[in-house]
Amino acid sequence: MTHQPSPVIHHHFAPAKINLGLSVLGVRENGYHDLHSLMVPLTVGDELEIRPAGALTLRVEGADLPTDERNLVYRAARAYLDAAGAAGGADLVLHKRLPLASGLGGGSSDAASTLLALAELYPAPDHRPVDLPALALTLGADVPFFLLGGAALAEGVGERLTPVDDLPPVHLVLANAGAEVSAGDAYRWLDETGDFSGKLRLEAMRLALARGVEVPYFNSLQAGVLARVPSVLTTLEALADAGLHSVLMSGSGATCFGLAHDAAQAQAAAAALAQRCPGWWVTAAQVRLPLSDNSGGRT
């Protein structure tokens, strides 16, 4: 009796992101917001396992999430397979490492990694090309960013991306006290005040990052979240007390970050903060630049 070899399992890394500054310039008539944000991928994130199969299945480990059309990974896989006219499917296993609804783009990154993985597994035929960025945008405004594999200036509603490749090394600590904030709520709270902002000062930010001094960035969503989610202020204060600088909320929250001067300081601050705040999600990380390829972190 002969045994068929098991399908090869492909591993893809789905990096978290932070916003090194997020300016909301205004709101459109359709309810979408115009943004100006420096988005950067990090060395921490979720992991995706994928292997070819006859049908599409999804299993999630590390979080209680749906495994059908309600899950963005499943929708991304279904969208790509349909667009490419692929005859097969895939067994997907998502290992969640990032906290949910945390401002780190975890779901969007997972979806982008799914698209990249399936494009490698089931390349679209020449007569039926798949526009991955366009497909990604149908899944969410942040998803196209994660196809780039590097830092980018995001404009429009987040769909206009300009790669940024001249950032210095950036070391940081991420912390989340356990709160979840939906992006919809964060933007609604901003709309209630109408406190929109001007564009980020990118050159000043680059210079400050290179010098390791306080970075002149801001997050337009932060004030509204602070007024309603007290643990975010506690998190920002804890990061500053740990000796980190330029503390800021990432995206719509509730994860916050502070910058360190080097990897050693980041690791020490993360260890001290985790000990002082048991139950928090805390980790050291660095900006994932540059990437050697655009594979989404395949290993």
Swiss-Prot record:
Residues annotated as transmembrane: none
Location of the active site: K17, D142
Pfam families on file: GHMP_kinases_C, GHMP_kinases_N
Entry keyword annotation includes Kinase: yes
Swiss-Prot/TrEMBL keywords: ATP-binding, Isoprene biosynthesis, Kinase, Nucleotide-binding, Transferase
Superkingdom field: Bacteria
Pathway assignment: Isoprenoid biosynthesis; isopentenyl diphosphate biosynthesis via DXP pathway; isopentenyl diphosphate from 1-deoxy-D-xylulose 5-phosphate: step 3/6
Catalytically driven reaction(s): 4-CDP-2-C-methyl-D-erythritol + ATP = 4-CDP-2-C-methyl-D-erythritol 2-phosphate + ADP + H(+)
Binding sites annotated in the UniProt record for ATP: P99, L100, A101, S102, G103, L104, G105, G106, G107, S108, S109
EC numbers: 2.7.1.148
One GO biological process term: isopentenyl diphosphate biosynthetic process, methylerythritol 4-phosphate pathway
Signal peptide: none
MF terms in GO: 4-(cytidine 5'-diphospho)-2-C-methyl-D-erythritol kinase activity; ATP binding
Family recorded in the similarity comment: Belongs to the GHMP kinase family. IspE subfamily.
Function: Catalyzes the phosphorylation of the position 2 hydroxy group of 4-diphosphocytidyl-2C-methyl-D-erythritol.
Alphabetized PANTHER family for the sequence: 4-DIPHOSPHOCYTIDYL-2-C-METHYL-D-ERYTHRITOL KINASE, CHLOROPLASTIC (PTHR43527:SF2)
Protein name: 4-diphosphocytidyl-2-C-methyl-D-erythritol kinase
Gene: ispE
